[in-house]
Amino acid sequence: MQVREQWRFAAACVVLATATAAAAQAKAPPAWRLAPDGFGPLKVGMPFAQVRKLVPELKATPVDLQASSGCDQLPLPGHPGVALMFVDNALRRIDLFRPGPRTTRGIQPGDPVERALRTYPGLAGAPRAYEEDDERFLTARSGANAIRFETEKGRIQNIYAGRWAQVQYVEGCL
């Protein structure tokens, strides 16, 4: 009888562990990657309504509370460290601002600058506004789009991708 109880206990532990792992996996954000033209299925140029079909939890900022007219920057629900910028109701830029989310080539905030330079040959460097000389923007243009790495103390601080004009914004929607 004791052996049977041990087997039941072991089976219950396996079921519990499997259920816990499945629940944790269900809560984990999809492994979407950032490219100059988008983040996972979210593509630069998509209207807000189309993005919202893919991310129903996404809520626009009321117009009277937006930092500037026609521009809205929102955290991406289910993706910690990711923000979306909409200009005139279309997705124009995606920001990565903490470790975790990565580019299609594996770079994330917190990585050494040297790794980004090796991974993205031909990055053009420019001084960051308001910052020290060794803090730079490293940018690669891809047609109408670009990807930009903001550096600080030898590391990637933030990554921006999207339309060339919006990737150049230094202060988000301001």
Kindly label every feature range from the protein language model.
Residues 172-174:
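Short, solvent-exposed mixed-charge patches
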Residues 26-28, 46-87, 108-156, 161-166:
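A cross-family detector of function-defining hotspots
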Residues 2-11:
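Bacterial N-terminal signal peptides that target proteins for export
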Residues 10-19:
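Bacterial N-terminal signal peptides
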Residues 20-25:
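Sec/Tat signal peptide C-region and signal peptidase I cleavage site
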Residues 34, 98-102, 133-140:
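Surface-exposed aromatic
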Residues 35-42, 100-107:
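Second-shell loop/turn segments in exported
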